[in-house]
A protein has these predicted regions:
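Domain-scale recognition of functional cores that engage charged ligands
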Residues: 1-281
Length: 282
């Protein structure tokens, strides 16, 4: 909540032009990657209406003047990717994909994916369509990756992080595992594999049976889990903030984003499919 307060205070004294420029910057980036095509030939590939980032995807599409599309509305032909609406077919030059790497194309990655578009990666490889962000960039979604972010800031920027992050530590590290076993009530345990998510276990509210089951699962395969410190009750918290950035002719990140309610370890809630649980912060 402290972060939100600071953002609101700054918005009262600073121009809102930066936020108004968000759509132009991101649309320009889509046009740049689409080899000069109009933003109308861009779609935001969304897995389904009931996914945790639906509001973010909807906001992103509206901002850049694109349409939210699901895999069932797209087809891959010898000429590229087309959006099918009744008898109308629209050629798509850029796909802003909001689908995880492994689910993007069932013919290339996981064959059981129901939200991916068959042959999409082949069309991308042949230069028939551009994918933003490209396959492989999903590595940043791995929860244990967040523990590297502060060190990356220090190493590449020579600065200290401006804001602390809710660090996820890999349970495969012996010291992390030992602390979890000694005092499970202090931590939350989440899966490290975004392809196989499971409901997190919060040690302070878990039953004895749930705690023992969680510890047993972590011992059997520690690589699959990460540990997070539970935030103290007195710690100011309330929202997880997700910002948008674009890399077209230059890098741009506006002073706004999507906020959603936090859980007790700083992680976002599991779903934000209504207007109550998601909000615009600018």
């Amino acid at each position: 909540m402290e972060l939100l307060t600071r953002l609101v205070d700054r918005s009262r004294t600073e121009s809102v032009a930066a936020i108004n420029d968000l759509g132009r910057w991101m649309a320009d980036a889509a046009v740049t990657y689409g080899r000069g095509s109009e933003a109308s030939s861009t779609v935001v590939l969304d897995p389904c209406r009931y996914n945790p980032t639906f509001r973010e995807n909807e906001f992103l599409a509206r901002t850049i003047g694109a349409q939210v599309a699901h895999a069932g509305e797209l087809v891959v032909s010898k000429d590229g990717v087309e959006l099918v609406s009744g008898i109308k077919r629209t050629k798509i030059t850029t796909i802003v994909r909001r689908v995880d790497d492994d689910l993007l194309d069932p013919n290339c990655f996981r064959p059981d994916s129901l939200v991916g578009l068959p042959e999409l990666c082949k069309a991308w490889k042949n230069g028939l369509v551009n994918i933003v962000n490209p396959p492989g960039s999903g590595v940043a979604s791995i929860r244990s990756f967040t523990q590297l972010v502060p060190e990356m800031i220090r190493e590449f920027l020579g600065e200290e992080p401006a804001l602390p992050v809710a660090v996820s530590r890999a349970c495969s590290a012996p010291d992390v595992m030992q602390k979890l076993i000694e005092n499970p009530a202090r931590f939350a345990v989440r899966t490290n594999d975004q392809m196989h998510p499971a409901r997190p276990c919060f040690g302070d509210s878990a039953t004895k049976a749930e705690t023992l089951s969680m510890l047993d699962a972590v011992r059997r395969d520690p690589e699959k889990f990460v540990r997070r410190d539970l935030l103290p009750v007195s710690e100011p918290r309330g929202f997880n903030l997700r910002v948008f950035s674009s890399m077209g002719k230059g890098f741009y990140m506006p002073r706004c984003g999507i906020g959603r309610h936090c859980q007790s370890d700083g992680g976002a809630t599991l779903a934000i499919n209504d207007d109550v649980s998601a909000c615009f912060v600018g």
